[in-house]
């Protein structure tokens, strides 16, 4: 059975108003910092995302585009390092990032919808909680996290696959929180209106 844990990412840092707003499209691949591999995929070598056939990860509920939403995603694939940077393509970690942006012209309404997604789908009433889960079934494990800022819900899923994928160290809550904080900072710096 999955083991669930939660931690507060940034309690009190998100104002109740929609003062944070993202008016334009967001490139999810521009959000991760250079230290993402060290934070979320230690002991691996990054390889092209198409190198291994992997299952698609649903990062946050309702992460498909629809009326009033725009979704962008990014996949980063890491293979277990056999030593000296030699990748073992049999064991991998897939990091999938998704950005759900509510496009309502009324920024308060858009922020309310983003908050509602966090509340309804992720059980987070404040919109700033980091939720992670770990499961292991048939050689597959997954962790996930999500955070809301203004009219955007940012999510990440970390999925491991392969016969010896357990040899890739799992990302700790601190690692996941640091990666989410980095991505949120980039989002606010580069995409805020």
Question: PLM features: what roles do these ranges have?
Answer:
Residues 1-3:
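Bacterial N-terminal signal peptides that target proteins for export
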Residues 9-12:
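C-terminal motif of bacterial Sec signal peptides marking the signal peptidase cleavage site
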């Amino acid at each position: 059975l999955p083991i669930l844990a939660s931690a507060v990412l940034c309690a009190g840092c998100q104002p109740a108003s929609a003062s944070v707003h993202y008016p334009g499209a967001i490139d999810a691949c521009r959000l991760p910092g250079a230290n993402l591999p060290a934070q979320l995929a230690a002991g691996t070598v990054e390889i092209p995302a198409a190198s291994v056939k992997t299952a698609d990860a649903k990062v946050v509920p309702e992460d498909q585009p629809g009326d009033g939403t725009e979704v962008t995603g990014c996949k980063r694939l890491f293979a277990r390092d056999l030593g000296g940077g030699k990748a073992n393509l049999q064991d991998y970690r897939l990091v999938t990032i998704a950005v759900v942006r509510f496009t309502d012209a009324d920024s308060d309404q858009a922020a309310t919808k983003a908050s509602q997604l966090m509340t309804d789908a992720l059980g987070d009433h404040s919109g700033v909680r980091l939720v992670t889960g770990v499961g292991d079934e048939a050689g597959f494990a997954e962790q996930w996290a999500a955070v809301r800022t203004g009219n955007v819900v940012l999510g990440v899923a970390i999925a491991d696959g392969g016969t010896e994928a357990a040899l890739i160290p799992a990302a700790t809550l601190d690692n996941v929180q640091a990666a989410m904080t980095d991505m949120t900072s980039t989002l606010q710096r580069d995409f805020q209106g």
